[in-house]
Amino acid sequence: MTIKSFCSFVSTPSAIRLRFRALAKAITALEKIDESILKQLPELKIIGKYGVGLDMIDLHAMKKYDVQLGWTGGVNKRSVSELVVSSAIALLHRSVFANAEVRKGEWYQVKGRQLSECTVGIIGCGHVGKDLVKLLRPFSCKILVHDILNFEDFYQENDVIA
């Protein structure tokens, strides 16, 4: 078996076809893989997707051309959830504003809010949403999770939306 290693992103369909030509297995990150690519790569049987989003992969075309998918869904859920919690706390406490004022040599009593006083709305409850719920529970905030249809109602009910 021949192993080829490429460490650069290719974005055009012709560059993708050229790079994956005669390969049975390939790992993609941001490359768009659709039917126009797959029909010209008959040797390709497995695509490993680096990262979590599948929006760049045409799953119907993969099935049509009998190409298998290797995917690590949820692999980054903790880092994304932690970023959401830390960003919410920083925004509620107005930390960025306070930091800027201190750097200018000024100090104001910044009145922020505590996460425990808020209602946090989570749009979708996939890998990240479920992990975010786990991280928010110790803050004793009200948590609403919903795969929503009516954004207006959802916006009205929440202080923090993730």
Give names to the regions the model predicted.
Residues 22, 43, 159-162:
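Glycine-centered tight turns that cap/initiate beta-strands
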Residues 13-16, 34-37, 111, 159-160:
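Acidic, amphipathic alpha-helical patches
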Residues 5-8, 25-28, 47, 142-147:
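Short, hydrophobic beta-strand segments that form beta-sheet elements in well-ordered domains
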Residues 25-99, 113:
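Phosphate/diphosphate ligand-binding glycine-rich loop within oxidoreductases
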Residues 1, 31-32, 147-152:
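Short, polar loop motifs at secondary-structure junctions
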Residues 101-108:
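A short, charged, Gly/Pro-tolerant segment at domain boundaries
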Residues 1-25:
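N-terminal glycine-/charge-rich "phosphate-binding" loop or analogous flexible N-terminal tail
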Residues 110-162:
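Rossmann-like dinucleotide/phosphate-binding beta-alpha-beta segment
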